[in-house]
């Protein structure tokens, strides 16, 4: 089996340097161009199964890459990015100023620290492993 992992194209929140996992940001013009470029790179690749995060930026990237193919794209919440909880939508500087203790804890225990109202990296890994076990 060959597995292709593709990241979504750029969004305005990427440009601003914001942490966002669950915020449903749309692709920027550059992000759309990136997806079209990827479509060209992958045009000769045959896919048995296409799965994307249901968030607009990821799903639209998959739609652009696959737009001339007759394959269904399945959305799967387990592929969503990390839920950054109280950090969601903020820049690193904003997080430093607003939540310094939580940021220190996250930096010290990145894999296990659960951001308040969000997830830990271990949570994300668990979701991804669960998804991988279910690949047909």
Which residue stretches match the model-derived regions?
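Active-site beta-alpha turn of Rossmann-fold NAD(P)-dependent dehydrogenases/reductases
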Residues: 7
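Phosphate-coordination/substrate-recognition cap region in phosphate-metabolizing enzymes
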Residues: 37-103
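Short, basic/glycine-rich phosphate-binding loops at helix/coil junctions
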Residues: 15-18, 101-113
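Extreme N-terminal starter segment of soluble prokaryotic enzymes
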Residues: 1-4
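Hydrophobic transmembrane alpha-helix bundles
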Residues: 13, 74, 84-93, 111-122
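Loop-to-helix element that buttresses phosphate recognition and phosphoryl-transfer chemistry
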Residues: 10-61, 114-129
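Short, intrinsically disordered, charge-balanced linker/junction segments flanking boundaries
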Residues: 132-136
């Amino acid at each position: 089996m060959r597995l292709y992992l593709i990241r979504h194209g750029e969004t305005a929140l990427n440009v601003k340097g914001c942490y966002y996992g669950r915020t449903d940001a749309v692709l920027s013009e550059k992000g759309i161009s990136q997806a079209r470029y990827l479509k060209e790179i992958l045009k000769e690749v045959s896919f048995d199964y296409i799965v994307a995060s249901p968030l607009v930026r990821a799903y639209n990237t998959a739609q652009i890459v696959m737009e001339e193919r007759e394959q269904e794209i399945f959305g799967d919440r387990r592929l969503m990015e990390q839920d950054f909880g109280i950090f969601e939508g903020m820049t690193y500087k904003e997080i430093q100023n607003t939540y310094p203790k939580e940021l220190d804890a996250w930096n010290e225990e990145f894999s296990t620290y659960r951001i308040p109202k969000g997830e830990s990296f271990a949570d994300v890994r668990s979701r991804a492993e669960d998804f991988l076990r279910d690949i047909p």
